[in-house]
From Swiss-Prot:
Residues 368-384 are annotated as: Interaction with WDR48. A motif (LXCXE motif) lies at residues 1428-1432. This is ATPase family AAA domain-containing protein 5. The gene is ATAD5. ATP binds at G1132, P1133, T1134, G1135, V1136, G1137, K1138, T1139. Keywords: ATP-binding, DNA damage, Isopeptide bond, Nucleotide-binding, Nucleus, Phosphoprotein, Ubl conjugation. Has an important role in DNA replication and in maintaining genome integrity during replication stress. Involved in a RAD9A-related damage checkpoint, a pathway that is important in determining whether DNA damage is compatible with cell survival or whether it requires cell elimination by apoptosis. Modulates the RAD9A interaction with BCL2 and thereby induces DNA damage-induced apoptosis. Promotes PCNA deubiquitination by recruiting the ubiquitin-specific protease 1 (USP1) and WDR48 thereby down-regulating the error-prone damage bypass pathway. Disulfide bonds: none annotated.
């Protein structure tokens, strides 16, 4: 067994890289001193691993360890069984089958079944054993019951049984021997340190015995077996049990054994038994060598018995774990100080391992030794008994030196292979460590597997070559058998791989057996067994998991075939993890496979064989490793002497044992060398140590060569294997730790002696069933199977990745290989190869440092194992306490102060339709274009025409006929596009089913270009069909489209959906757009001339006669070019259509735009490199489909538009902003170019699509006007001529050559990385031959930007026109809206069209607003007087029938509350609540007050002076609307809303001036009358013009109610008339009491207003917005056209606000404003109480108290709209002039200053003007001149005049 362990250790090293192994081993020595005491070190080759295994030191008392361990083992076993439950349950069946398999033992199929039965039976045995005390008899009786029956049968026909077992064992050995030997060792130690070791050792012994019936018999003489039997009184039982155990192992009894094979041994007993074992081991091994094959067969029986006894003993602990009595030597029997420390450590480990023979271990088991060794070790020891002298023959100093040379030279190979090339001794040591530690064994197997995989391609031949002709013969036989087996395998390919591996494994087993037995007959028997086992394995694989196990088996078999070529460690581990994960996750049909997979995790090969037999697999792999090693040992006659090192170490357990291998005669040594070489090549790490000891330098060199070859194969294979085998996405370390935790839980009482640093790492990877030192010591890690990533329930999505990760980690446990494996997850094979190559040249010292770091990392990971592992995909683990933490008991943490926002819980109120907008993509009704938006019905033609008429009457001068047909057409086109996209996606879905992987790749690369034509052709057909279906639907239902498909999938922004296609579609700025269009037209003409000139020039080159004409034309062109400026700067506010105008004109004229916007990297170098070539010529994209598609410059993604990334959903994306390759964006467009062009322009969808649209439009009942239809047809033709409609065929000749145009967006926005951006623009301007357009929102940019360019200024379009445009957009979306909402919205957004449209889309797609029943308001005046006004204005005859229709037609409800939603008022007031009525209502409740404060705070946070702007409507004073004036046509006049917004026309001024005329009226009748009349006009104009600092939102429903109330009062007041009022006021100042009372009433109201305005002015001056203190934006300077350029004030101010936040500032302002307003309102209300008394006295002051408001002002809910009158501009100019003077330039708050200063200045100017008129004869000194207030005289005159 020690030999097996050594082999496992040797196998493990190969994955470890030489440099890494050396440091690990050196550490081992250093650690060994401590490790000898601390079995921990044995477990973990690296200190880090050890620490990982048992981070906290265990009690020094071994009894505590073991006593804890056995129960822990039972628990662990139970836990492990639970973890491995699926696999172990199979083993239980396997145990049951074990009995059957004995019968079936002769039959391969029966063996397979038996293996399964043995597994299940073993599981039962394990359970029983776990329950059973240390007494093996009871467990043995149970095991023996099933196993003994098998064994009895086998013993009855020992030879037959042996042969069958041999066949089975050989097969298992072939399949498993290399991996399984390691696996069984690993499994026994890792999974069930006691049970597993006994079981695995027992299995291996039995398997070897069965395989070679002489295998064990040869290696284990009868005497040895007898000694074992003698040692263990229960040996006979054990033999029976072992035989049955072997059968059960073959039948997957290993799992059960693993679970139950742990023995508790006292320290004293351990020492005593160790001495006895040492004495016994040597003779036993010697006897085993001497014993003939027959004797061997007997011995095999006895050996099986003894092993079974041991296994039973260990089965009590755990079947697989064999406790070995280690001999205590004060000094390792063989240590050479001359040899480097690394090799000395390895050699010492080998010596120690050799000293502790399997016999000794078995004896120790009898004595309950503290050390657990696997069967293979026992078997090896039994197989070869030798003197301690044999150790020297194993590795001489010269050999060591040679090895060191080889080790140093092939560092890269060593790194890759885990120091396969490094000394055999290292490998042996590693193997020993692995062997000692079940995990090590697994890691060895993994190493072997990795090595085998690496060599697998070359591996079989190499392996055969290495092993020799005999091995070749065996391999051939095995191959033949394997081929047969493969044929039998359910999956031939997988079975074939598995068989190949099995062949190699069998070959190795045969070698080992041959080495052990040295008999051809036994070899033949082994071949037969191996072939049988292979067949069984393959069959079992098929049975258990045809896919997974077969894969595993193939992997394992490959590993076996060429331990050289076998699957890399990763593969093995992958296989294990895969099988386990499949078993656990998928609950593979065979719990056996699961248990096997668990074992496989311990042994990758075992997992492969698991399909056959977990026991057999383990035995095979173990036998491979152990048999080769054992053969080497037997030939060498080397014994393992166990040496107890007592050097105290704090961090390690008190007992540490070193196993020294005692090599025997050189003949056997040579044989072993050959075998070891072969095994080294094949097994990689398993036999590497034995080989190292026995191999000569030649062997080493050969091994190095093989390793190098194998590494290359391994690199390629490991990756593939990882992908195939490992289902879990996890790093090797992660896998290992959870597995180790599992192991520790299952096998707590097993002590694993680990001498090889790399061995432990590999076992960790394999460790699902391997025991870790924690398990051995009884240290139970609190990781349940659930926590183990391998067992985690993982979504199938992540299985492949996890499998890969798990595969990579396997090699990572060798220090170097660990790093490599960890990186393999991230890097591809080439990266790993490069890294290995680079690492190969590193000095040993550096390699050691790297290994130390890796070890420290392992230690850290081990320490952190107590915490729940972080898994990205992890389901809630009910067993984990972290998911059930109690809330903190601290009241400070549990009792938080509840924030009382005083917001009404709307859910408790009656839910109004639209109050909660839930987006459901699947709604029942598919009739609406906005199906998911409350399923709005498609408006019929009658309804649409009525609503259009309503819009027309709200804004009669807006050309609805110009815009609405185009908008409606775009909506229909969008629906067609969406249906096409849907069909395209359906097509893609169909294709994706056939080409899933390829489709995924293409999706990432945004679709291959090759597929586009086919896709488009298919899509065209589908689209045509769908469009026909749509038209049919429309005909039948009157609905445009069934939006059920489109619902919820609209990904196109409305700014792109309704983007203007021609210059005529733009709103406002007609002159600027016309100028831009003419400029581009000139450039287009010039480009065409140049093109013609070039064509002529080419012809003229042929005909030189025309050269004179050419020169002349060229000169004229040059003159024209010099006259035409190539750059235009467009300035204007944001969102007014600058970029839209550029695109519309370019679309119309056929320009192709290269856009560089702020989202691109715009450094000058990048721009020049990307665009310079394109700027040197006019034409781009000679062939036309894509000629006008814009190109977005983006340094990051040249192939994509920077503005949008195609979304995976079914979406209709912007035709302009989305990369053309996306079918969504391209829609009807054809193959799009690979450039960064996005079809910004609205491209009509191909001729067929146009026909469809035409049909839709014709079928659309909503459009019946012949004009509208004409408009549509005209638009179509226009689009066709303008290349808006890009037919797939050819474009017009003029469109084929697209003139390029460079558009630089937001040139005033420059980031740090945009170095040289402006200089690059200037370079373009100077050198380009194409037009360049710059856009900016900074009005001062033209002043600071040097260059020759023309400036075109865009201004804010008419507010009412934009509102009507938005209404039409809503109408196309089947929403009826109120113009007041949009006027308020645009006022709040300062008429930003883009922002408003986007918000409108959000609002409508969110379900719209509150639906209100509203009559059709065909009016030009106030909505209150709808019918009257309509009759007054004399509606056309057209409208009357419509009005009559209105009564018949069910008008849709009106969606209101758009602006309120924007301002968040719906969160404060329920939709049914009226804001204005709430404010007019006297607030008495605390809740109402909180609501009022919150409302005002919300407005303050949005810089909206709500109360100030809406005093007319919220004060209890009457309001009257002034009739329409000639200025109402304002829409024709464009006003800068933002500037208007900045103009502060204060109500205070209005009130103060109103007060003045009232006082004056008392003096002069006529003048008073005039003033009063002017006063009303004054207020009208004042209210016409908004206070620009005020962007106010509107409450639609409430204002209507209020205005209706106030309207009655106004109408009454008006009925009385201003004239009679004026006549009354004309008389002398009131002397009567009635007159005095009325004057007092008016004066009191004015005083209250003035007080309120004074308070607000004070607040404005005192409490400035904190946010504006630290930044200076254009808002502060726009009134003077001044601005701080971007970037100068972007940094945060160092000043602190002392915690004064904008929130607190807004709350303070809101509170003061609320208090002041409440005082004012209550005072006015109180004063109005005297109104009736005044009326009784005969005087009605109502007219004096009335607010007169313009109709436009009345249209704005609660914000003053930007006035469209010239007076507003005059006022703004006056304000700018006054406050730009030096004296007033630095006045603090602009708003407060305007309110405070302007009224006084106006009064002074008026007075001074009168004085000047009176002093006409002499010079007049103006007051302003006297105080040196330098205001221009023109401004003074303007101030002196009445308000403009």
């Amino acid at each position: 067994m020690v030999g097996v362990l050594a082999m496992a250790a040797a196998a493990a090293p190969p994955p470890v890289k030489d440099c890494e192994i050396e440091p690990c081993k050196k550490r081992k020595k250093d650690d060994d001193t401590s490790t000898c005491k601390t079995i921990t070190k044995y477990l973990s080759p690296l200190g880090k691993t050890r620490d990982r295994v048992f981070a906290p030191p265990k009690p020094s008392n071994i009894l505590d360890y073991f006593r804890k361990t056995s129960p822990t083992n039972e628990k662990t076993q139970l836990g492990k069984e639970c973890k491995i439950k699926s696999p172990e349950s199979v083993p239980v069946d396997s145990n049951k089958d074990c009995t059957t398999p004995l019968e079936m033992f002769s039959n391969v199929e029966f063996k397979k079944k038996r293996k399964r039965v043995n597994l299940s039976h073993q599981l039962n045995n394990i359970k029983t054993e776990n329950e059973a005390p240390i007494e093996i008899s009871s467990d043995d009786s149970k095991e023996d019951y099933s196993l003994n029956n098998d064994f009895v049968e086998s013993s009855t026909s020992v030879l037959r049984y042996k042969k069958q077992v041999e066949v089975l064992a050989e097969n298992i050995q072939d399949t498993k021997s290399q991996p399984n030997t390691m696996t069984s060792l690993q499994n026994s130690k890792k999974v069930n340190p006691k049970q597993g070791t006994t079981k695995n050792d027992f299995k291996k012994l039995r398997k070897r015995k069965c395989r070679d019936v002489v295998d064990l018999s040869e290696s284990l003489p009868l005497a040895e077996e007898l000694n074992l039997l003698k040692k263990d009184g229960k040996d006979t039982k054990q033999m029976e049990n072992t035989t049955s155990h072997a059968n059960s192992r073959d039948n997957v009894t290993e799992a059960a054994q693993l679970n139950d094979s742990i023995i508790t041994v006292s320290y004293e007993e351990f020492l005593k038994s160790h001495k006895e074992n040492k004495v016994e081991e040597i003779p036993d091994s010697t006897m085993s060598i001497c014993v003939p094959s027959e004797t061997v067969d007997e011995i095999v029986k006895s050996g099986y018995i003894s092993e079974s006894e041991n296994s039973e003993i260990s089965q009590q602990v755990r079947f697989k774990t064999v406790t070995v009595l280690a001999q205590v030597h004060p000094i390792p029997p063989k240590k050479t100080g001359k040899i480097p420390r690394i090799f000395l450590k390895q050699k010492q480990f080998e010596m120690e391992n050799s000293l502790s023979d399997p016999e000794n271990e078995q004896t120790v088991q009898k004595r309950k030794s503290n050390v657990v060794i696997q069967e293979e070790e026992l078997e090896l020891a039994v197989l070869e008994a030798g003197s301690s002298e044999a150790v020297k023959p194993k590795c001489t100093l010269e050999e060591r030196q040679q090895f060191m040379k080889a080790f140093r030279q092939p560092a890269s190979d060593a790194l890759k292979n885990g120091v396969k090339k490094s000394s055999d001794k290292q490998k042996d040591l590693n193997e020993k460590c692995l062997y000692e530690v079940g995990r090590d064994d697994n890691s060895k197997k993994i190493m072997e597997n990795s090595g085998i995989q690496m060599v697998s391609k070359n591996g079989n031949l190499q392996l055969h070559t290495d092993k020799g002709s005999f091995l070749k013969e065996k391999n051939k036989k095995l191959k033949k058998k394997n081929k047969k087996t493969l044929d039998t395998g359910a999956i031939p390919g997988k079975n074939r791989e598995g068989n190949t591996q099995k062949k190699e494994t069998t070959f190795f087993l045969k070698e080992k057996q041959y080495q052990n037995r040295m008999s051809l007959r036994q070899r033949k028997t082994e071949f037969f067994k191996s072939s049988t086992l292979f067949n069984n394995e393959s069959l079992v694989y098929e049975d258990i998991a045809n896919d997974d196990l077969l894969k595993v088996s193939s992997l394992c078999n490959n590993n076996k075939l060429s331990r050289k070529t076998s699957i890399p460690v990763k593969d093995i581990k992958l296989t294990q993890s895969k099988a386990e994960s499949e078993a656990s996750l998928l609950n593979v049909s065979t719990p056996k496979s699961t248990r096997r997979s668990g074992r496989i995790s311990s042994t990758p090969t075992t997992e492969t064989i698991r399909g056959i037999d977990s026991d057999d697999v383990q035995d095979n792999s173990q036998l491979k490793a152990s048999t080769q090693k054992a053969a080497n040992l037997s030939e060498k006659h080397s014994l393992y002497t166990a040496e107890l090192i007592t050097v105290p170490f704090d961090s390690e357990s008190p007992i540490r044992m070193k196993f020294t291998r005692i090599s025997t005669p050189k003949k056997s040594k040579k044989k072993s060398n050959k075998r070891s070489e072969k095994s080294e090549a094949t097994d990689g790490g398993f036999t590497s140590q034995i080989r190292k000891a026995s191999n000569t330098s030649k062997n080493i060199s050969k091994a190095k060569q093989l390793i190098e070859k194998a590494k290359a194969l391994h690199i390629s294979r490991s990756k593939v294997t990882e992908e195939i085998a490992i289902p879990l996405r996890r790093s090797s370390r992660h896998q290992t730790l959870p597995e180790r935790k599992k192991l520790s839980e299952t096998e707590d009482s097993v002590i694993i002696i680990d001498s090889s640093p790399t061995a432990l790492k590999h076992p960790e990877k394999n460790q699902k069933k391997l025991q870790c030192l924690n398990d051995v010591l009884g240290k139970k890690l609190n990781t349940s199977t659930k926590n183990v990533p391998g067992k985690m329930k993982v979504a199938p999505l992540f299985l492949v990745r996890k499998a890969q990760k798990a595969a990579d980690p396997v090699p990572s446990f060798d220090e170097s290989s660990q790093d490599t494996s960890e990186k393999s997850q991230d890097c591809d094979v080439q990266c790993k190869a490069k890294r290995d190559f680079l690492m190969s040249g590193l000095p040993d010292l550096l390699k050691r440092q790297i290994a130390k770091k890796a070890a420290a990392l392992d230690v850290y990971n081990a320490v952190s194992t107590s915490f729940q592992r972080v898994v990205h995909v992890q389901q809630k683990d009910d067993g984990c306490c972290l998911w059930h933490l109690k809330p903190p008991s601290c009241p400070l943490l549990t009792k938080f102060k509840e924030l009382n926002t005083k917001v009404i819980d709307l859910s408790k109120c009656g839910i109004a339709l639209g109050e909660f907008s839930t987006l459901n993509s699947k709604l029942k009704s598919g009739n609406s274009a906005a199906v998911f938006m409350r399923t709005r019905k498609e408006f019929t033609e009658e309804v649409r025409n009525l609503l259009l008429e309503e819009i027309r009457w709200s804004n009669p001068e807006f050309s609805l006929k110009k815009y609405f047909p185009l908008l409606l057409k775009k909506q229909i086109e969008h629906q067609v596009l969406s249906s096409e996209c849907h069909s395209k996606q359906e097509l893609e879905a169909d294709v994706s089913h056939k080409e899933t992987k390829r489709k995924l790749v293409e999706a990432e690369n945004s679709k291959s270009k090759r597929k586009k034509p086919n896709e488009y052709s298919k899509n065209l057909e589908k689209t045509n069909r769908k469009s026909e279906e749509l038209s049919k639907r429309n005909n039948s239902s009157g609905i445009k489209l069934d939006s059920s498909k489109d619902s919820g999938t609209e990904d196109m922004l409305w700014t792109e959906k309704y983007q203007p296609q021609t210059a005529s579609e733009l709103i406002g700025n007609e002159l600027a757009i016309k100028k831009l269009h003419s400029w581009l037209k000139d450039w287009k003409r010039r480009a065409e001339l140049e093109e013609r000139q070039n064509l002529k020039g080419k012809r003229d080159e042929k005909h030189e006669d025309f050269s004179g004409g050419i020169d002349f034309k060229g000169s004229s062109d040059d003159e024209e070019e010099s006259r035409l400026c190539n750059t235009v700067l467009i300035t204007g506010p944001t969102g007014v259509g600058k970029t839209a105008a550029v695109y519309a004109c370019a679309q119309e004229l056929g320009f192709k735009i290269f856009e560089v916007n702020a989202s691109s990297q715009r450094s000058g170098r990048q721009i020049l490199s990307q665009l310079k070539e394109a700027t040197q010529s006019h034409q781009v994209d000679k062939q036309g489909v894509n000629s006008q598609k814009p190109c977005f410059f983006n340094s990051y993604y040249i192939g994509k538009s920077p503005k949008k990334i195609s979304s995976p959903k079914k979406v209709v994306t912007s035709p302009r902003k989305v990369p053309p390759p996306s079918p969504k964006s391209s829609g009807p467009k054809r193959a799009l170019p690979p450039k960064t062009l996005a079809n910004y322009f609205k491209v009509s969808p191909k001729p067929k699509n146009n026909e469809e649209i035409g049909m839709l439009l014709e079928n659309n009942k909503g459009i019946k006007n012949s004009f509208e239809q004409k408009q549509i047809t005209q638009t179509k033709s226009t689009n066709a001529t303008n290349s808006n409609v890009k037919d797939v065929g050819a474009e017009e000749p003029s469109r084929k050559n697209a003139t390029s145009l460079i558009l630089f967006e937001e040139v005033d926005v420059i980031f740090d990385e945009d170095a040289g951006f402006l200089n690059a623009i200037k370079t373009f301007m100077a050198t380009t031959k194409r037009p360049v357009i710059l856009t900016t929102s900074d009005p001062t940019f033209s002043l600071m930007f040097d260059g020759c360019f023309e400036e075109i200024k865009f201004s804010t379009p008419s507010l009412l026109n934009v509102a009507s445009y938005l209404q039409m957009i809503c109408l196309t979306e089947n929403f009826r809206t109120d113009v007041k909402d949009f006027v308020t919205l645009l006022t709040a957004n300062t008429c930003d069209i883009r922002k408003s449209i986007l918000y409108l889309q959000f609002w409508i797609r969110s379900g719209g607003g509150v639906l209100e029943e509203r009559p059709l308001t065909l009016y030009r005046g106030n909505s209150r007087n709808v019918q009257l006004v309509c009759s007054e204005h004399g509606l056309d005859n057209k409208i009357y029938p419509k009005n009559t229709k209105k009564k018949r037609v069910d008008l849709p409800k009106c969606d209101s509350g758009c602006a309120e939603t924007l301002f968040g008022l719906k969160n404060i007031f329920s939709p049914s609540e009226d804001l204005f009525s709430f404010l007019k209502h006297k607030i008495t409740m605390k809740e109402e007050w909180h609501k009022f404060i919150q409302l005002l705070t919300e407005f303050q946070m949005r810089n909206v002076d709500f109360l100030y702007s809406n005093l007319e409507f919220i004060l209890p004073l009457p309001v009257d609307t002034i009739p329409e004036t000639k200025n109402f046509c304002g829409p024709s006049v464009t006003v800068d809303a933002s500037a208007a917004t900045k103009s502060m026309n204060c109500l205070a001024r209005k009130h103060s001036e109103r007060e003045q005329p009232l006082k004056k009226s008392q003096k002069k009748k006529q003048k008073k009358t005039l003033v009063i009349l002017d006063d009303s006009d004054l207020f009208d104009t004042d209210l016409d013009f908004p206070d620009q600092s005020i962007s106010l939102s509107s409450v639609s429903s409430s204002s209507n109610a209020e205005e209706s109330k106030t309207g009655d009062e106004e109408s009454k007041a008006r009925d009385k008339g201003n004239n009679p009022e004026t006549k009354k006021s004309i008389p002398c100042p009131p002397k009567t009491t009635a007159g005095k009372k009325c004057s007092a009433l008016v004066s009191h109201c004015l005083n209250s207003l003035s007080e309120f305005m004074d308070n607000m002015s004070f607040l404005d001056a005192l409490l400035t917005d904190v946010r504006e203190q630290n930044k200076y934006g254009r808002n502060d300077f726009s009134w003077t056209n001044g601005k701080v350029t971007s970037g100068l004030c972007d940094e945060f101010s160092l000043e602190s606000n002392d915690g004064w936040t904008s929130q607190s500032s807004g709350e303070l302002k809101a509170a003061a404003e609320a208090l002041s307003f409440t005082k004012c309102s209550s005072a006015i209300s109180k004063a109005l109480e005297t109104l009736n008394s005044c009326k009784k006295l005969g005087r009605d002051p109502t007219n004096d108290l009335t607010f007169y408001v313009s109709q436009k002002r009345n249209n704005v809910y609660f914000s003053q709209s930007a006035a469209n009158l010239d007076n507003a501009w005059k006022r703004i100019s006056v304000i700018k002039s006054v406050f730009s003077s030096r004296s007033l330039l630095y006045v603090g708050n602009r708003q407060a200053s305007i309110i405070e200063y302007l009224p006084t200045l106006r009064n002074i100017c008026k007075t001074e003007k009168l004085k000047e008129q009176g002093k006409s004869k002499r010079r007049f000194l103006h007051y302003f001149e006297g105080i040196h207030l330098d205001i221009p005289k023109e401004t003074v005159n303007t101030l002196a005049a009445d308000f403009p």
